[in-house]
Amino acid sequence: MKRFTQALIAVIALCTAQLALSQEAIEITSGTDKATPIAVVPFGWQGSAPLSEDLAEISANDLRNTGMFAPMERSNMLSYPVRGEEINSRDWKMIGVDYVVVGQVTNQPGTDRYELNYSLYSILREQVLLSKTVSGTQSQLRDM
């Protein structure tokens, strides 16, 4: 029985080693030649002192750097909604935007804590696709 167990372990080890040594090739056959138009609207702010980081601009730059999105310049935006219900889909369709990100940053009074509520809105579907709340300290703003 001991030899059988050893032989079984050896066979399993060989099979596992063979699988580990096999390499898979990933072939990319197509991509996108046009980035998706998106607007990251300046986030609303509720706090006593100016916010040290422009979280909307950071988000827009991160999206641009993926190569998959083309964030709209703020100067071309017709409005600056803070919540999804303030979005006028007709305006965004007119300027060729498919998605809009809106948000609100709040400083919790008397603390170093901040809360960011943001939503991703589909202009074509006229609905919120994602809504999330994250929080952190002032030193964590860029990571929020």
Label every model-predicted segment:
Residues 25-90, 104-107:
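Short beta-strand->alpha-helix linker/helix-N-cap micro-motif
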